[in-house]
Design a protein with these regions (language model features):
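Cell-envelope and extracellular/periplasmic
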Residues: 54-381
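Terminus-proximal functional modules
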Residues: 1-56
Length: 381
């Protein structure tokens, strides 16, 4: 019996793509369709094969570029559409994460806090999204939880790093977290920040989680290099009367993070923790429309700070000026003929929020968000 396999090849140039495709052809793969430019710096070619094929690149990386993911819900797995681990959300053997939960996946292999484990669509953030399953999910296929962008950021960066290197994601996000409101929670060196931790700031449990896990990722291997921090946060501060304090509190935390990491300067991109870029992502149109003044205060403060190593990445609209898709049912509909079920199929009890347009969709987390974040990392690093 033969099985059909699908995969994608990513490359930084036509010549790079040709070289990689040549290797795949020797392994029994065939091109499927034509190459597509998914970013100005990335070509992608779908490939397919019948029967047994060689799966290349399955060896463990010698070392890792470390990318920290921090902030609140739009920084993590809050995409409600059905996870697609057999296709769009397929893991890659060169992309790992630092563990937090007791098993790699629900009911899967055991792991311990800060182990290096495979990364997938639902990373080990402070808030556990792995049990909020889509009603159409087939858990036997790994379609558990919700969809985030971390895996996809890493996939888009793979063509630009050495073949013996991988990407180690450090997930430290917590939905509903803010600088100016929210429970502080607790921190343990053995388990990280508690799930009820929802307050950012110097010395807070979420900060202790962030800095300790970043250090742990670098301590895993002296060759590991901290490449960037991807930060998406500000929504929950907008609803606070003290929202204007957020920019100063963020800057104080950024300064402290760099100071605390200075002992690892040799493992930081550019040779200093101060040179590691903070890539600060935008939010959905709902927040700007609802809290216009507050949005400008908080997200405006991320802008025009390139000289400080802070880079703002807009997500409000796509290249045609259309609002980036959210979990609103009309923006992530079901497509039964294709076997896809979006946020539209979720109801109370399995939604990430009843206010659907407050969070980006699964498709946005596979496309425009990682495309732009990865491009910003490449431009800044």
């Amino acid at each position: 019996m033969t099985f059909k396999h699908y995969d994608v090849v990513r490359a930084a140039s036509p010549s790079d793509l040709a070289e990689k495709l040549t290797h795949k052809l020797k392994e029994g793969w065939q091109p499927f369709g034509s190459p597509v430019a998914i970013t100005p710096y990335t070509l992608m070619q779908a490939i397919t094969a019948e029967g047994d094929v060689v799966v290349s690149g399955a060896t463990e990386p010698d070392w890792y570029y470390v990318i920290v993911l921090a902030g609140q819900s739009n920084a993590m797995a809050y995409g409600e559409g059905l996870p697609l681990p057999d296709s769009y959300d397929a893991p890659d053997p060169r992309i790992k994460q630092l563990a937090r939960r007791s098993t790699v996946t629900p009911g899967g292999a055991a792991c311990r806090y800060n182990d290096i484990i495979p990364a997938d669509h639902c990373l080990h953030d402070v808030q556990d999204m792995s049990t909020l399953n889509h009603p159409k999910a087939d858990l036997s296929k790994g379609q558990y939880g919700c969809v985030g962008q971390g895996l996809h950021i890493a996939k888009k960066l793979l063509p630009y790093i050495p073949n013996n290197a991988g990407i180690l994601l450090v997930p430290c996000c917590r939905g509903g977290s803010a600088f100016t409101q929210g429970a502080e929670g607790t921190f343990s060196a053995d388990t990280g920040a508690s799930q009820d931790s929802a307050r950012w700031g110097v010395g807070k449990p979420l900060y202790q989680d962030l800095i300790s896990r970043t250090k742990a990722a670098l301590q895993k291997n002296p060759k590991n290099v901290l490449l960037a921090v991807c930060w998406m946060q500000g929504e929950f501060d907008m609803s606070a009367a003290t929202h204007a304090q957020q920019p100063a509190l963020f800057t104080a935390m950024l300064t402290q993070f760099r100071a605390d990491l200075s002992v690892f300067n040799a493992q930081c991109h550019g040779g200093s923790a101060a040179d590691v870029p903070w890539i600060c992502g935008d939010t959905t149109y709902y927040w700007k429309n609802t809290y216009g003044t507050q949005y400008n205060t908080i997200y405006g403060a991320y802008k025009n700070r390139e000289s400080e190593g802070v880079y703002f990445v807009p997500f409000m609209t796509d290249g045609n000026g259309v609002n980036t898709a959210t979990n609103a049912p009309a923006e992530d509909p079901d497509i039964p003929a294709s076997g896809y079920y979006g946020a539209a199929s979720r109801t109370n009890g399995n939604q990430v929020s009843s206010n659907r347009p407050t969070h980006f969709s699964s498709w946005a987390r596979r496309s425009i968000i990682p495309d732009r974040l990865a491009t910003a990392i490449l431009n800044a690093a």
